[in-house]
């Protein structure tokens, strides 16, 4: 009697474990067919961040901070990467730009929208700073010239003439840069719809018949 109970219990346990072993065998066979490779994870979704403007040089930290707002610096094992600088500009953003000229390449940066007056003023101010730096460098190079104390009056006269020419050309270049900056700011203000004035309506003067 005891043997019969033991046999029935073993058969009952074997019947319950058969489906589980079948499922486990199917999973092992699928893993064997794939060669034991793990499924490749999908690439992470990259965030795109709109830029206010594009700097002519990424070494200009002030321009980078102004143009690329809320930059997150991601520390990777290889190098430190500025997040958001490499996103390409859309075609619709390029359509808002003014037609570029050869002189625009000297700007500190290029705004993404012509309606952003603060951005235009910031980018155009870089030309004035660059002109002042050129003027100061030329004047310092002139001061570092040869010593004319032992060469006579002719050398001193030549240095004076050269210094006046350098100063005159530098001041003229600075004046042209400032006038161009003002012209571009006026152009950007004309493109701003808020600053455009409404067309003036003609006012007709009506005379009172009592004064005729």
Curated annotation (Swiss-Prot):
GO CC terms of this entry: basal part of cell; cytoplasm; extracellular region; extracellular space; rough endoplasmic reticulum lumen; transport vesicle; Weibel-Palade body
SMART domains according to UniProt: END
Pfam families, per the entry: Endothelin (PF00322)
Basic and acidic residues compositional bias, start-end: 168-181, 189-205
Entry keyword set: Cleavage on pair of basic residues, Disease variant, Disulfide bond, Secreted, Signal, Vasoactive, Vasoconstrictor
InterPro entries, per database record: Endothelin, Endothelin_toxin_CS, Endothln-like_toxin
Positions of region (Endothelin-like): 109-123
One Gene Ontology term from the biological process aspect of the record: positive regulation of calcium-mediated signaling
Site, as annotated: Cleavage: 73-74
Main location: secreted
Segments crossing the lipid bilayer: none
Cysteine pairings via disulfide bonds: 53-67, 55-63
Subcellular location: Secreted
Highest taxon listed in the record's lineage: Eukaryota
A single GO molecular function term of this UniProt record: hormone activity
Region of interest (Disordered), residue spans: 168-212
Propeptide residue range(s): 18-50, 74-212
Medical condition linked: Question mark ears, isolated: An auricular abnormality characterized by a cleft between the lobule and the lower part of the helix, sometimes accompanied by a prominent or deficient upper part of the helix, shallow skin dimple on the posterior surface of the ear, or transposition of the ear lobe/antitragus. Auriculocondylar syndrome 3: An autosomal recessive form of auriculocondylar syndrome, a craniofacial malformation syndrome characterized by variable mandibular anomalies, including mild to severe micrognathia, temporomandibular joint ankylosis, cleft palate, and a characteristic ear malformation that consists of separation of the lobule from the external ear, giving the appearance of a question mark (question-mark ear). Other frequently described features include prominent cheeks, cupped and posteriorly rotated ears, preauricular tags, and microstomia.
Biological role: Endothelins are endothelium-derived vasoconstrictor peptides. Probable ligand for G-protein coupled receptors EDNRA and EDNRB which activates PTK2B, BCAR1, BCAR3 and, GTPases RAP1 and RHOA cascade in glomerular mesangial cells. Also binds the DEAR/FBXW7-AS1 receptor. Promotes mesenteric arterial wall remodeling via activation of ROCK signaling and subsequent colocalization of NFATC3 with F-actin filaments. NFATC3 then translocates to the nucleus where it subsequently promotes the transcription of the smooth muscle hypertrophy and differentiation marker ACTA2.
The protein's name: Endothelin-1
Encoding gene (name): EDN1
């Amino acid at each position: 009697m005891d043997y019969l109970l033991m046999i029935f219990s073993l058969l009952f346990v074997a019947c319950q474990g058969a489906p589980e072993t079948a499922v486990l065998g199917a999973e092992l066979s699928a893993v064997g067919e794939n060669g034991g490779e793990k499924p490749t994870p999908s690439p992470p979704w990259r965030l795109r961040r709109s830029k206010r403007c594009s700097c002519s040089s990424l070494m200009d930290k002030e321009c980078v901070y102004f143009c690329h707002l809320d930059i997150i610096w991601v520390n990777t094992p290889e190098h430190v990467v500025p997040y958001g600088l490499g996103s390409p500009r859309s075609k619709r953003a390029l359509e808002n730009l003014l037609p570029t000229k050869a002189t625009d390449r000297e700007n500190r940066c290029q705004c993404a929208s012509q309606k952003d007056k603060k951005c235009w003023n910031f980018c155009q101010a870089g030309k004035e700073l660059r002109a002042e730096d050129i003027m100061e460098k030329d004047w310092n190079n002139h001061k570092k010239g040869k010593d004319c104390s032992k060469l006579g009056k002719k050398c001193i006269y030549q240095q004076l003439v050269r210094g006046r020419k350098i100063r005159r050309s530098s001041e003229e270049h600075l004046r042209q840069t400032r006038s161009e900056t003002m012209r571009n700011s006026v152009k950007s203000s004309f493109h701003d719809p808020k600053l455009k004035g409404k067309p003036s309506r003609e006012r007709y003067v009506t005379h009172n018949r009592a004064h005729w």
